[in-house]
């Protein structure tokens, strides 16, 4: 069962980060115009600085899709990430040490939830929600850095 605190936290994250942009496989990440900084930096700016009505509407859609993915999915996530790893210390809400974490794909499409049982596997996209394995407590939104023409490869960085 997901706690009220987790639901409240997720409902408020919409204002905490910019709207993600869709990166086509033919568009290298380094040429996409996205600003990516190291984990020690300020994170990634995934949208423009002018919050138009469309951007605000898309951000609300993204938050609803994140909630749907986290709360309505019967699966427990893609992979286990150790909370003792240095790679996750820069999450916006780091978990206590020793907690197991899972990644959940984040989609921009309305009502899209990742199908873990599809064959061949679906493209999860570069963006991931990180939550604790057992309680699904929200820890942050991260994205792959991308390698060449593949935006789903490479190291992760925090999305703001």
Curated annotation (Swiss-Prot):
One of its GO terms (cellular component) is extracellular region. The active site is at residues 103, 144. Disulfide bonds: none annotated. It is found in: Secreted. InterPro entries: Ribonuclease/ribotoxin, RNase_U2. Coiled coil: none annotated. Residues 1-18 form the signal peptide. Its EC number is 3.1.27.-. Its main location: secreted. It comes from the Eukaryota. Keywords: Allergen, Hydrolase, Nuclease, Secreted, Signal. GO terms for molecular function: RNA binding; RNA nuclease activity. This purine-specific ribonuclease cleaves 28S RNA in eukaryotic ribosomes, inhibits protein synthesis, and shows antitumor activity. Belongs to the ribonuclease U2 family. This is Ribonuclease ARB_07070. It comes from Arthroderma benhamiae (strain ATCC MYA-4681 / CBS 112371). The lineage of its organism: Eukaryota, Fungi, Dikarya, Ascomycota, Pezizomycotina.
């Amino acid at each position: 069962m997901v706690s009220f605190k987790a639901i409240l936290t997720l409902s408020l994250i919409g204002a905490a980060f910019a709207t993600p942009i869709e990166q086509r496989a033919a568009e290298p990440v380094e040429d996409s115009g996205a600003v990516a900084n190291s984990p020690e930096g300020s994170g990634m700016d995934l949208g423009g600085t002018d919050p138009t009505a469309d951007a605000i509407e898309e951000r609300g859609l993204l938050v609803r899709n994140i909630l749907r993915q986290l709360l309505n999915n019967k699966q427990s996530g893609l992979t286990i990430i150790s909370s003792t790893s240095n790679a996750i210390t820069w999450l916006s809400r780091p978990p206590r040490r020793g907690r197991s974490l899972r990644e959940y794909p984040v989609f921009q499409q309305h009502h899209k939830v990742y199908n873990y049982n599809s064959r061949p596997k679906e493209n999860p996209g570069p963006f991931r929600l990180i939550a604790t394995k057992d309680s699904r407590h929200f820890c942050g939104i991260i994205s792959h850095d991308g390698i060449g023409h593949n935006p789903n490869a490479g190291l992760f960085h925090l999305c703001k």
